[in-house]
Amino acid sequence: VACPRVVGTTLNFHLWQDGDATEITLGGVRQPVASATPVSIETIDLFITPLLGCGRTGMRLGYGGGFYDRLFVTARGFRLGVGFAQQHVSDWQAEAHDKPLNGFLSDSELVLFHPEY
């Protein structure tokens, strides 16, 4: 499993398995330590993506940092948003930098928007 690590305004990915060392970010999120083995984003086939909401056309409402929007400019893996059914909502006005998801997985459904990647 490759997990994201925040470095400035970028997400870098590192190998992680149960028992490996982690550290807690300012937001309280665990991430791999800096010395963990790096993983190139070109080798990642599936990005499990956190979100606050997902629109009916796959537009993702994130947490405001733009980390995943910047990542998805170059990352080519399948972008799967994961949340609860209540987070699959009507669309809102996306901004120019927003990148759509390929799919959304909730406790009640799997929806594919842009299955090609």
Regions found by a protein language model. Name each.
Residues V1-I41, L80-A94, K99-L101:
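Extended, well-folded interaction surfaces typified by the phenylalanyl-tRNA synthetase beta subunit core
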Residues A2, I48, F78-V82, G103-L105, ...:
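Hydrophobic/aromatic beta-strand patches that form the interior of the parallel beta-sheet core
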Residues P32, P50-L52, F84-A85, D107-S108:
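Fold-independent oxyanion-binding glycine-rich loops
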Residues S35-I44, L101-Y117:
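A charged, well-structured terminal subsegment
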Residues T43-V82:
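Active-site beta-strand/loop microenvironment that shapes enzyme catalytic pockets
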Residues R56-G58, R70, H88-W92, L112-H114:
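Short active-site-adjacent structural elements
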